Amino acid sequence: MKSLKQQKIAVLLGGTASEREVSLNSGAAVLDALRSQGYDAHPVDPKDMPVADLKQQGFERVFNILHGRGGEDGVIQGVLEQIGLPYTGCGVMTSALTMDKMRTKMLWKGFGLPIADMEIVTKNTALSLEPQAIVARLGLPLMVKPSREGSSVGLTKVDSADKLKSAVDLALKFDDIVLIEEWLSGDELTVPVLGDEVLPAVQIVPEGEFYDYNAKYISDNTRYICPMPMSDERWDELKNLVKRAYEAVGCRGWSRIDVMTDSEGNFRLIEVNTTPGMTSHSLFPKSAATVGYSFEKLVEKILELSV
């Protein structure tokens, strides 16, 4: 068996999803980190070269840093399984499932794990939407989001029943399934998992009302506190919850799980990122750094976990 450093490694980056730019940035950082440690790593953009040809081109392993649809939704993973190349991150089923926020949440709910109360709307049911009834059940404000778009695209905070319809219509432009969720007014945090190690939680403090695309990728005024201050008991509770959430959907390798707290301080699971960002702004490397992983060593560890 060749050692990892003797293998030709493809770093999959770019792609065609709305998060292409983020993936190009993450990919460049990962590529540098691998090359600086003596790996034979090469950038491959599926936009320019079919992933199905990787084996013919002599590649032996894949570091997947594609974000969003086409890269994080099981499609690429299926191609890699088909041609028999080991790759980083989650497998086909988990990647497909976690791309769909609604189905992920239903699964967690089935396992008895805490999620936000929500109403599910489809293109068909949107026609008979009853804003007053939804507000009566879930209260105000509400969060409206497409089920399958990443990077906070298509999100709206709704403050009154009469604005619900237009928020749903906006979200339906990005997906056929839309979630209307109770507003969680507590803290926003994200917890990375590396192999079977839960890394310190990062608290996200956006300057606006919630963590949108601007706060994620552009603004320098979003504050990140890592590790997030909490008691040991509270951290144990969060760590166990994240581990159960990770295992319930079948994650492997690495993932990042977003969590919020409600007005009473109870944790609620939000979503899973199976290919977290790896840019200078990204939260996974920020968290890993607090327990001694340099960016280079983190990238190497993710590669070592590839199957």
From Swiss-Prot:
Its cofactor is Mg(2+); Mn(2+). InterPro entries: ATP-grasp, ATP_grasp_subdomain_1, D-Ala_lig_Van_CS, D_ala_D_ala, Dala_Dala_lig_C, Dala_Dala_lig_N, PreATP-grasp_dom_sf. Pfam families: Dala_Dala_lig_C, Dala_Dala_lig_N. The keyword Membrane does not apply. The keyword rRNA processing does not apply. One of its GO terms (cellular component) is cytosol. Residues 105-304 form the ATP-grasp domain. This is D-alanine--D-alanine ligase. It comes from Actinobacillus succinogenes (strain ATCC 55618 / DSM 22257 / CCUG 43843 / 130Z).
